[in-house]
Amino acid sequence: MKKAMPAGRQGFTLIEILISIAIIAVLTAIGIVSYVSINRNARDAKRRGDIEQIRSALELYRSDYGYYPAPASGGLTNLVDTYLPSIPSDPKGDTNPYVYQATNLSATTGQYYGYCLFASVENANLTNTLCDPKPNGYNYGTKNP
């Protein structure tokens, strides 16, 4: 047996429905913005971690050989197998791979005693390039200590 609704109360009003839809829309927008921001920060964290991993491998190479690998003789590929399982790649694909530049070339030995590593980060607040000039499109980097 159905109970009759009290007089004057037939369901939700249009205003109540519109307010509910507006609240849901605002919460959805906040969720989408947070999701995009979290993904961007995660990709940047991976880039910074990759740069640190390459930096560590370069330092191990230098401790074994006394100098850093020359870019013309393979550069970072010299690190694979012995110091790195593989060369890390950018989380968004190979559109902006990591860049290695050997520096401080010795005129007497022909060996490199410095380097710069570059990545392209999405968060403008993380930009840090200790080496200049930096390659076009790259805004984060480090150099040998």
Language model features by range: what are they?
Residues 2, 8-35:
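N-terminal single-pass transmembrane signal-anchor helix
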Residues 3, 47-48, 63:
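N-terminal export/targeting and maturation segments
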Residues 5-6, 145:
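Intrinsically disordered, low-complexity repeat segments enriched in small/polar residues
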Residues 9, 46, 109-112:
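A generic fold-level signal
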Residues 32-52:
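Aliphatic-rich helix starts adjacent to a transmembrane/signal segment
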Residues 59-121:
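Extracellular/periplasmic head regions of type IV pilus-like filament subunits
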Residues 108-145:
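Short, surface-exposed interaction loops/tails
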